[in-house]
Amino acid sequence: YSTGVQYQYYYGLTTGFFDKYGNHMSVSDIHQGDVVDISGADSDGKAKRIQKSDKVWTNDAVTNFSVDKNNSVLEIGNSSYRLGERTMIFSGSDVIDTDSLTAQDKLAVVGIDKDIVSISVTTGHGTLQLSNTSLFEGSFLQLGDRIFAEITKDMSLDVPEGSYTLAVANNGWGGSTDIEIKRGETTKVNLNDLKGEGPKKSSILFEVDVQGAKIYVDGSEIDYTSPVEITYGKHTLKVTADG
């Protein structure tokens, strides 16, 4: 790392792999971006011992980060670290640059003091691309149970890789579908395929345990003692009570 020179080493059945504490581990426990100490060689020139370095720190679950490209700085939480010319950034087997990192990524970071040695994207992102959005513009899409976004014309959205149920609804039209977001790829969805038969309504039963509470949907007070029929889509909900 200090010289910037790259070397290629080989390992075999007799090679021992160890964590930084000296405990045995498998070769599968070594990942892109790890820093290791390599010692000895057998008669075939293969390494005898490969051990994770105890001279570096690691953070395998970085999500709160930002990159200051102008100053070559990686911010993790409230701490700043230097990005150098020899800092390696990986996504799977690919070497990437800081422009490819987004806030949706989860990183494994290795450093020495305040210098970043390597960054590996452990959970990457892909792109969701919507088409024929006009019927749903101004309403919200839902991806899984954590991602909500207002729909705009033919929008695209960076999304962490994984499997999701995509749901859309507006003015009584809508539906859902299962999608797969793959790292570095674009998943295209035509919202015309999700509008379904409409306009549709859904019955909502409100559970209220505050005496005298009032509920308003789209500015109108409702009787919540029985299920209320509401069209699919975006609505405003207001609850008031004395005190």
Task: Give the positions of each predicted feature.
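Solvent-exposed strand-loop boundary residues in beta-sheet-rich modules
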Residues: T3, D145-I147, G172-G174, G219-E221, ...
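Short, flexible, surface-exposed loop segments at domain boundaries
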Residues: Y1-Y10, K20-R82, S93-L143, D158-F206, ...
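LysM (lysin motif) carbohydrate-binding repeats in extracellular/periplasmic proteins that recognize
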Residues: S79-S91, S220-E221
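N-terminal beta-strand/beta-hairpin edge segment
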Residues: T15-G16
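Short, solvent-exposed S/T- and G/P-enriched segments that are highly enriched in secreted/extracellular
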Residues: N23, D94-I96, R146-D158, G219-I230
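Short, solvent-exposed loop/linker segments at beta-strand-coil boundaries, enriched for Pro/Gly
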Residues: F136-G138, I147-A149, V210-K214, E221-D223
